[in-house]
Amino acid sequence: MMEGVRRAVAKFLRGGGVYEKAVDAFVKDLQRELIKADVNVKLVLNVTRRIKERALKEEPPPGVTRRDWMIKIVYEELVKLFGGDQEPQVDPPKTPWIVLLVGVQGSGKTTTAGKLAYYYVRRGYKVGLVSSDTHRPGAYEQLKRLAEEAGAMFYGEREGDPAEIARRGLEDLLSRGAEIVIVDTAGRHGHGEEARLLDEMKAIASKVRPDEVALVIDASIGQKAMGLAERFHKSTPIGSIIVTKMDGTARGGGALTAAAVTGARIKFIGTGETLGELEPFAPRRFVARILGMGDLESLLERIKSLEEAGELDRAAEDVLKGRITMRTIYRQLRAMRKLGPLGKVLQMLPGASMLASIDEGALKLGEEKMKRWMAIIESMTYEELDRPEIIDKRRMRRIAIGSGTSVDDVRELLVYYKNLKTMMKKLKRDKRLLRRLGMEL
């Protein structure tokens, strides 16, 4: 959905011709992308009708084009669609804080439990994980391993009554000083199984008395998330929703909008497989990334969490100010594994709508390519590091021999450098536009 909407935005902003016809074409493109993302058709028609009406009636302020104002309208209406101005309260209002994770089998509860633990450990909390799932083979071992990776305490039993296991786990972890306790529960398949799941969930809730019940939903179920959330809510009031696997499905938009319609608060979204790829869901920031306006706040949060934060702060400042050299790229590469794929990082920058014109393959750096590029940069002279434009064919051959790579590898790195420079020039223009629109993000 992100890529499709971003392409539509870029096409609209670059296009010419009659404004009214351009609006019609953009609205149709937007409808197509939202429906492909499994957003409810009625919701799609309502939001695009409001966008079109406002785009044709409203007059932009001096200095702002009608097309730029149109994107501001799209931004505001999509924010409403995805839940409005809600900002999740991620830090618990008190400690200890007990979180009960619930959901159907396959939704990613256990992985999410590990991600939540990692998220709060990084924020300075002492976290404990409880495995009460005695039904799924390997659930105990999986959560224990995740607890170790996240730096959290763990309690679990392979057999027994799940509600009693949860109670004993809570007592044990609190006695060890846990400030946040996350209880992982079993899931079920099928309607009849779901009824038993809800009964078990109520039994566990009565034993641990959670401060928050978080429903974990797989993004791939799309708009079915609405019915699922409502059924769980009738059994035990749902305090928050976590939508997982947003990176692996085109139906994530449907799941998010469906959950938002229920009135439940979407607190986190899972954006990848690693422990660090869980982020608070803020509709304004999410929509900004969809439209290519960026999400600098999320980017800076990731940067601050890195062990190499000091080094990356300099790299981020260089990128945002357009001062890009091979030294900047080298610092990016060194911390890339913790930041996540470069494509995701660049989506957080204003101007990401222009990424549609850049070869996506050049942005998805694998481990081997990262190693090759770092070796190439290490083989450059100081002058080449600061002025990559001087690197000609003769220098390419020398660098390739010195780094144990090929001339094609060196050329590929230089193409990436030029693409990044080009994108940052467009970023400056977009930042000025956002300020005029009063949409600093």
From Swiss-Prot:
Listed GO MF terms: 7S RNA binding; ATP hydrolysis activity; GTP binding; GTPase activity
Domain notes: Composed of three domains: the N-terminal N domain, which is responsible for interactions with the ribosome, the central G domain, which binds GTP, and the C-terminal M domain, which binds the RNA and the signal sequence of the RNC.
Pfam families: SRP54 (PF00448), SRP54_N (PF02881), SRP_SPB (PF02978)
EC number(s) on file: 3.6.5.4
Protein name: Signal recognition particle 54 kDa protein
GO biological process: SRP-dependent cotranslational protein targeting to membrane
Family the UniProt entry places it in: Belongs to the GTP-binding SRP family. SRP54 subfamily.
GO CC terms: signal recognition particle
Subcellular location: Cytoplasm
Subunit organization: Part of the signal recognition particle protein translocation system, which is composed of SRP and FtsY. Archaeal SRP consists of a 7S RNA molecule of 300 nucleotides and two protein subunits: SRP54 and SRP19.
Main location: cytoplasm
Keyword terms: Cytoplasm, GTP-binding, Hydrolase, Nucleotide-binding, Ribonucleoprotein, RNA-binding, Signal recognition particle
PANTHER family per the UniProt record, alphabetical: SIGNAL RECOGNITION PARTICLE 54K PROTEIN SRP54, SIGNAL RECOGNITION PARTICLE SUBUNIT SRP54
Function description: Involved in targeting and insertion of nascent membrane proteins into the cytoplasmic membrane. Binds to the hydrophobic signal sequence of the ribosome-nascent chain (RNC) as it emerges from the ribosomes. The SRP-RNC complex is then targeted to the cytoplasmic membrane where it interacts with the SRP receptor FtsY.
Catalyzed chemical reaction(s): GTP + H2O = GDP + phosphate + H(+)
Record: residues binding GTP: 103-110, 184-188, 244-247
InterPro entries tied to this protein: AAA+_ATPase, P-loop_NTPase, Signal_recog_part_SRP54_M_sf, Signal_recog_particl_SRP54_hlx, Signal_recog_particle_SRP54_M, SRP54, SRP54_GTPase_dom, SRP54_N_sf
